[in-house]
Amino acid sequence: MCGAKSNLCSSKTLTEVEFMRQKSEDGASATCLLEFAACDDLSSFKREIEENPSVEIDESGFWYCRRVGSKKMGFEERTPLMVAAMYGSMEVLNYIIATGRSDVNRVCSDEKVTALHCAVSGCSVSIVEIIKILLDASASPNCVDANGNKPVDLLAKDSRFVPNQSRKAVEVLLTGIHGSVMEEEEEELKSVVTKYPADASLPDINEGVYGTDDFRMFSFKVKPCSRAYSHDWTECPFVHPGENARRRDPRKYPYTCVPCPEFRKGSCPKGDSCEYAHGVFESWLHPAQYRTRLCKDETGCARRVCFFAHRRDELRPVNASTGSAMVSPRSSNQSPEMSVMSPLTLGSSPMNSPMANGVPLSPRNGGLWQNRVNSLTPPPLQLNGSRLKSTLSARDMDMEMELRFRGLDNRRLGDLKPSNLEETFGSYDSASVMQLQSPSRHSQMNHYPSSPVRQPPPHGFESSAAMAAAVMNARSSAFAKRSLSFKPAPVASNVSDWGSPNGKLEWGMQRDELNKLRRSASFGIHGNNNNSVSRPARDYSDEPDVSWVNSLVKENAPERVNERVGNTVNGAASRDKFKLPSWAEQMYIDHEQQIVA
């Protein structure tokens, strides 16, 4: 150790020979003190001083170390106090200062560094205690080295080697600010929080509609706040510019409750179009995850906004197949968007049909009377009154006349309300209603491709649209063309004028109307003999000749028409036997046979 030869060379102009000669002549004892000070060997340090009275405790020697403020290594001139401060040797440092024979502000070599410079550049574990001891020994923190750096300036360069708490303490000690004053300032900075005045108009985010599930899932931190004055964002249920709690509307943006991995890294390139949740609020307030788990604090939860249920009755049901939450009954009852309006509500259009919602058709829920009530009330297009009147068909006119005879006039129908509809139309037999709802009934109607399945109107009236669609379809044009051969004088036939003699817009194959059709056909055959008629009649010269219908009607129609009329009069028990007449098909076949003959 002491006196041993070294092959290391100095970083200065000293050559190896000169360094070894100087060390062997003058610095042998000083080098031993530096080694004892670096190892914090107080007993050896004392023995060396006591055995060699000529050795000064403040004697400098060359020590191989890193230059202060630099990364270069070399032999630098240091005192035992500087080496003890550099390596954090507490016992040796206290002993040297206690002797009073060492200057804590001594400057060595051309670097002009002090013990404080060495203590800061050493970055030892006990750097704070070392600096306190030196400052208590009247060390000056304002001493400047050859590069113009104070000890506190060296801390900024070597701060990565010092723990955060130690760095702050060293900075406080070297800047001359007492710890108590600094602590008071830190407490003041922590206590400086923006306090807003009490705002009575600011709603409570946990009371009323603001605490419901629907508001939390679809409106909380989604809708922008309309308050122009400054207020506490944490107490406001609406979103503000630059707020981290901002959420996307899950009804507008189809994203899931799964956190976005890109958003966690900083920013998502997809923005609002991302299919994952951006942030904690979007993830836990998503309808698929909100209040699907119990809070660990349950009823003792003190959070302002909690994503979990505090009681079991607050848990939202989870779909077993998808794993996501379903609409809670409390939310569906409170939200007007989840409610379904009744089709019998006059003056408004129904949102969903009863069949779509799975509600069976019955007279009490308005399924059988939906078409009739809709014809009396404005449709969803809100057409004006004149256009509605122009769309009334002849069947509606006939129904009005029949209702007048039966005591159900327009005034009574006009006063229909949801309160008295059940009294007016509540006389259906339950057996007939079940027959109308049976699958065989629908399958029987579905085999007619040209007529849609419609519900029969009340009071035994047959559906005009179902019969007209079956008879007056593509074959009506063939009837019009082939009937021209039976006219004495061929005239261009206008299919649009082929109607009932009373001039109504549409008509069904009823018994009384067939008689009218028979008379109108005879007028077309015998010519325009208007003198034999006691009153002016309509000119039927342009209508097609349908005289061949007479024989067909006499042979086939009366029996079947009588049978259908009888079934109609019998009441609602025979409505399940409704089907399109087959005599129309037989009429077409017989007519073609006559043409071929």
UniProtKB/Swiss-Prot annotation:
GO molecular function term, any single one: DNA-binding transcription factor activity
Q: Where is this region: Disordered?
A: 320-341
Q: Where in the cell is it found?
A: Nucleus
What does the UniProt induction comment state?
By salt stress.
Extent of Polar residues compositional bias = 320-337
Entry function: Involved in salt stress response. May positively modulate plant tolerance to salt stress.
Protein name per its UniProtKB record: Zinc finger CCCH domain-containing protein 29
Species of origin: Arabidopsis thaliana (Mouse-ear cress)
